[in-house]
Design a protein with these regions (language model features):
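Alpha-helical transmembrane bundles and membrane-interface segments of multipass inner-membrane proteins
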Residues: 1-198
Length: 198
């Protein structure tokens, strides 16, 4: 499944970007990078786009969960395995559909690595208790809907963006996915009806 190269690329890009933000020190490989102080923010395009280093123990886009850290991590593992298996089952489907799954899988694995290993790698907590590194701070639009207000979008990372793009691809092109599967059945039914009438 060549589409898995997209998944691998997303995971690598996501982890490299997080190491550059948080910093990494691997003496035996001669790798040492300081990173940014937690909470620091650097403007890229004025106030519209900033690099803001935050960590969260919860879900995507800096959304925290009060309890159930282990449950969330285990659910992420199960979901990643499920998506990979589903992608294998759908290996003969339309490329765009498989691409959307590959993007979602890459993002899921990227954040899963943070949750499973970062606590141990950085000496901050035990296995499965790591925090997700977020840093893309963009002011896309304000939200004011049914009492919910958001003046600035949640801080996110490459993995979050990959999952979101994959889901949007599925939503936007869902009709074409369904039509492609239904077309052979419709053609077969029409052919049968024609033969019967003859």
């Amino acid at each position: 499944m060549k589409v898995l190269f997209v998944t691998i690329f997303i995971v690598i890009a996501d982890q490299i970007s997080k190491f550059m933000i948080k910093g990494i020190d691997i003496p035996f490989l001669g790798i040492s990078f300081q990173g940014m102080p937690l909470g620091n923010s650097i403007p890229v395009f004025g106030d519209f786009l900033r690099i803001t280093f935050i960590e969260n123990p919860g879900m995507a886009f800096g959304i925290e969960v009060v309890d159930g850290k282990i449950f969330l991590t285990m659910f992420s593992i199960a979901a990643s395995i499920g998506i990979l298996f589903y992608l294998y089952l759908m290996r003969s489907e339309k490329l765009l559909f498989r691409l959307s799954l590959a993007l979602i899988l890459g993002g899921a694995i990227g954040n899963l690595i943070d949750r499973v290993f970062y606590g141990v790698i950085y000496g901050e907590s035990s296995l499965f208790h790591g925090k997700v590194v977020d840093f893309i701070d963009a002011d896309f639009f304000n939200i004011d809907f049914l009492g919910f207000q958001l003046s600035r979008f949640w801080v996110f990372n490459i993995a979050d963006a990959s999952v979101s793009i994959g889901v949007l691809l599925m939503l936007f092109f869902h009709r074409s996915f369904v039509d492609q599967k239904e077309l052979p059945a419709i053609e077969s039914k029409s052919s049968t009806e024609v033969n019967t009438s003859i």
